[in-house]
Amino acid sequence: MAKRYLLDFEKPLVELEKQIEQIKELARDSEVDVSQQLLQLETLATRRREEIFKSLTPAQKIQVARHPQRPSTLDFVQMFCDDWIELHGDRNGGDDMALIGGIGSINNRPVLMLGHQKGRDTKENVVRNFGMAKPGGYRKALRLMQHADRFSLPILTFIDTPGAYAGLTAEEQGQGEAIARNLREMFGLTVPIVATVIGEGGSGGALGIGVADRLLMFEHSVYTVASPEACASILWRDAAKAPEAASALKITGKDLLKLGIIDEVLPEPSGGNNWAPLDAGNTLKEAIEKHLDTLLQMTKDELIEERYKKFRVLGKFIEANNIEEIYSEIPPQSE
């Protein structure tokens, strides 16, 4: 079993984990019955882990969402897909490995599944570009979604990206146009679309496959217009203020559900999805099946109309009767 990667705020668990491993080694190397001690330590570790994860700040949730052992798109595909055939290429000479897709079936129901894919180590992350898709990735995604629309396949998307790749080559190849085209075309698809934020949901990179009839989020996932680090650098010119930015951006599932941005927050196992990936997979599978059962009862016209309405009402603003009222709400700037 791979060694668990503990985050900074999980450090109180380090000593307990060491003791648990020592007892397990003792049990393997001798005939001493240590089951009672092992049970006590594991129970204590579980209780402390639950206490820690019940009070996570938005900045800490970002760390969980970025955890290197968090289940990825391909992990979930393998967990609950009866069969899976990956489809490649954007039909324009590229095959972006940061955004993958293919046809599979869930309980004998054929679906198109696509999502961002990060790597587990440095070598794989270089191949996957750390989950940051280039224009070709979004064009591949659109090709696959149009294929699904043609053959009446429900679309499942899995969002896990810090953002679309912002390098010079991506701009030269039309990153903005590729994402904008996806947004426009997804509003016109006549099949159900269920999107899930399984890790990071960053900026336009997430939106490029995020126009959906139902948008779900795991409990410790994040969905944001910009990374807190970028936001802090822009607003305060200090990336160290990222924790404050994370709180102000309202990036957690609880906040976004209250704002009407997402439709459901999926609970995670104690310690996050990386501690019990199979439990996370079962939770996601049940949620997807529930929403698909509802959406498949709707006509094509109803799907398009409801999807349009869902996004049309997003966003809020405050009206003031006069300009003085607006300025009175702005704190004075120090010299």
From Swiss-Prot:
It catalyses: N(6)-carboxybiotinyl-L-lysyl-[protein] + acetyl-CoA = N(6)-biotinyl-L-lysyl-[protein] + malonyl-CoA. Its EC number is 2.1.3.15. Its main location: cytoplasm. Gene3D superfamilies: 2-enoyl-CoA Hydratase, Chain A, domain 1 (3.90.226.10). GO terms for cellular component: acetyl-CoA carboxylase complex. GO terms for biological process: fatty acid biosynthetic process; malonyl-CoA biosynthetic process. Keywords: ATP-binding, Cytoplasm, Fatty acid biosynthesis, Fatty acid metabolism, Lipid biosynthesis, Lipid metabolism, Nucleotide-binding, Transferase. Pathway: Lipid metabolism; malonyl-CoA biosynthesis; malonyl-CoA from acetyl-CoA: step 1/1. It is an enzyme of class 2 (transferase). Coiled coil: none annotated. The keyword GTP-binding does not apply. PROSITE patterns: COA_CT_CTER. It is found in: Cytoplasm. The keyword Ion transport does not apply. NCBIfam families: accA, AccA_sub, PRK05724.1. Component of the acetyl coenzyme A carboxylase (ACC) complex. First, biotin carboxylase catalyzes the carboxylation of biotin on its carrier protein (BCCP) and then the CO(2) group is transferred by the carboxyltransferase to acetyl-CoA to form malonyl-CoA. Belongs to the AccA family. Acetyl-CoA carboxylase is a heterohexamer composed of biotin carboxyl carrier protein (AccB), biotin carboxylase (AccC) and two subunits each of ACCase subunit alpha (AccA) and ACCase subunit beta (AccD). This is Acetyl-coenzyme A carboxylase carboxyl transferase subunit alpha. It comes from Prochlorococcus marinus (strain MIT 9312).
